[in-house]
Amino acid sequence: MGTTLDVSRAELALVVMYLNKAEARDKLCRAIQYGSKFLSGGQPGTAQNVDKSTSLARKVFRLFKFVNDLHGLISPVPKGTPLPLVLLGKSKNALLSTFLFLDQIVWLGRSGIYKNKERAELLGRISLFCWMGSSVCTTLVEVGEMGRLSSSMKKIEKGLKNGNKYQDEDYRAKLKKSNERSLALIKSAMDIVVAAGLLQLAPTKITPRVTGAFGFITSIISCYQLLPTRPKIKTP
């Protein structure tokens, strides 16, 4: 009975910890937003209203969030990182920070505080292009980092000779990191499609339903990436 209660308490603590993260709540709202976009298919109705209202609400979560990527822009990079990956990483930070900053003006426009509607819409499109550019940079960074991980894993395999590579702690750590980067690569590549859909760059191919489906999947991936580590329950 005590063990069952301990497990339940630990599970609830994980849920509380997860929901206390502003980023996690934002991604859950994002899943609702794009799920509604998928259901509406761009047609007027309840689902489209949920899509629009959730999109506006999410912008409040992101107020002053651009500071995070500004900090990343000026922060030092790990030693040994190739220059192309450094430049791509810094470009991603700059573009994402610009997107988040401009998104605040979009929120001011849609909430009626900023009266120049045309300029707000223009800045909205520019911000989406910045987000699309940051997703492209992220995709290229993940491809490059996965290549570096693959190379170092092959070196470990050669060093082990006939040993079991999965019993090597360093190899397992790099394999886990590689899996995480693979998931991040899928997410960033799909986000490029989402951005293209929001910008209506290929409206006949990337329809609101396609945009909603891709956005929902990337939101679920983001929610998964933010999951806290499960604590080990001591058994008597």
UniProtKB/Swiss-Prot annotation:
Family, as annotated: Belongs to the peroxin-11 family.
Organism: Arabidopsis thaliana (Mouse-ear cress)
Gene Ontology terms for molecular function: identical protein binding
N-acetylglycine PTM sites in chain numbering: 2
UniProt-listed Pfam families: PEX11
Superkingdom of this protein's organism: Eukaryota
Membrane topology: Multi-pass membrane protein
Gene field: PEX11D
Function: Involved in peroxisomal proliferation. Promotes peroxisomal duplication, aggregation or elongation without fission.
Protein name from the UniProt record: Peroxisomal membrane protein 11D
Subcellular location: Peroxisome membrane
Transmembrane segments: 93-109, 208-227
Tissue specificity of this protein: Expressed in developing siliques.
GO term, biological process aspect, one: peroxisome fission
Keywords noted in UniProt: Acetylation, Membrane, Peroxisome, Peroxisome biogenesis, Transmembrane, Transmembrane helix
GO annotation, cellular component aspect: chloroplast; cytosol; mitochondrion; peroxisomal membrane; peroxisome
Induction summary: Up-regulated during senescence.
